[in-house]
Amino acid sequence: MTTTYFGPWLIRQSEIFFTTELSFALVNLKPVLPGHVLVCPKRIVPRVKDLTKEEFTDLWLSAQRISSVVEEHFNGDGITFAIQDGKNAGQTVEHVHIHIIPRKKFDFENNDQIYNEIEKEREPRSYEEMEKESSELRPLFEENKNKTF
């Protein structure tokens, strides 16, 4: 069985819905909006500048594919991609990760309010909720594995 970490935390395989050789995506413990997921390199590196070219490319190609699927699945009409790269940028987990958040018109009064929400402390959801979402997302990537994004 594969062991996956997000920073210092062991991630249950049931929370992961997408993997490549170099990246993985997981559902978010404390989502800002429905469909808020994270994509990370498998290698734990603290900053974007620490990624290899291959990891950087794979991470963003994965983000592109994941965003397309979650936007459609959660009936969004836009995506917010967010990276907090370094402590002074708001990074709280020293493992590069991209927040992928499906958006809808008027989901916030001010569009940029989402960045404040990412920074706020939020209530964690249950592992059962996370596993349910992950199990809904996982087959969508099988269905779309040959689709060009």
UniProtKB/Swiss-Prot annotation:
Compartments it resides in: Cytoplasm
EC number(s) per entry: 3.6.1.29
InterPro entries to which the protein is assigned, alphabetical: Bis(5'-adenosyl)-TPase_reg, FHIT, Histidine_triad_CS, Histidine_triad_HIT, HIT-like, HIT-like_sf
Residues binding substrate: N28, Q84, G90, Q91, T92, V93, H99
Ranges of residues in domain HIT: 1-115
Necessary cofactors: Mg(2+); Mn(2+)
Disordered: region residues: 120-149
One annotated Gene Ontology cellular component of this protein: cytoplasm
Reactions accelerated catalytically: P(1),P(3)-bis(5'-adenosyl) triphosphate + H2O = AMP + ADP + 2 H(+)
Note on cofactor: Divalent metal cations. Mg(2+) or Mn(2+).
Alphabetical keyword list: Apoptosis, Cytoplasm, Hydrolase, Nucleotide-binding, Transcription, Transcription regulation
Motif (Histidine triad motif): 95-99
Main location group: cytoplasm
Catalytic residues of the enzyme: H97 (tele-amp-histidine intermediate)
Subunit comment: Homodimer.
Purpose of the protein: Cleaves P(1)-P(3)-bis(5'-adenosyl) triphosphate (Ap3A) to yield AMP and ADP. Can also hydrolyze P(1)-P(4)-bis(5'-adenosyl) tetraphosphate (Ap4A), but has extremely low activity with ATP. Modulates transcriptional activation by CTNNB1 and thereby contributes to regulate the expression of genes essential for cell proliferation and survival. Plays a role in the induction of apoptosis via p53/TP53, SRC and AKT1 signaling pathways. Induction of apoptosis depends on the ability of FHIT to bind P(1)-P(3)-bis(5'-adenosyl) triphosphate or related compounds, but does not require its catalytic activity.
Record protein name field: Bis(5'-adenosyl)-triphosphatase
Species annotation: Dictyostelium discoideum (Social amoeba)
Gene that encodes the chain: fhit
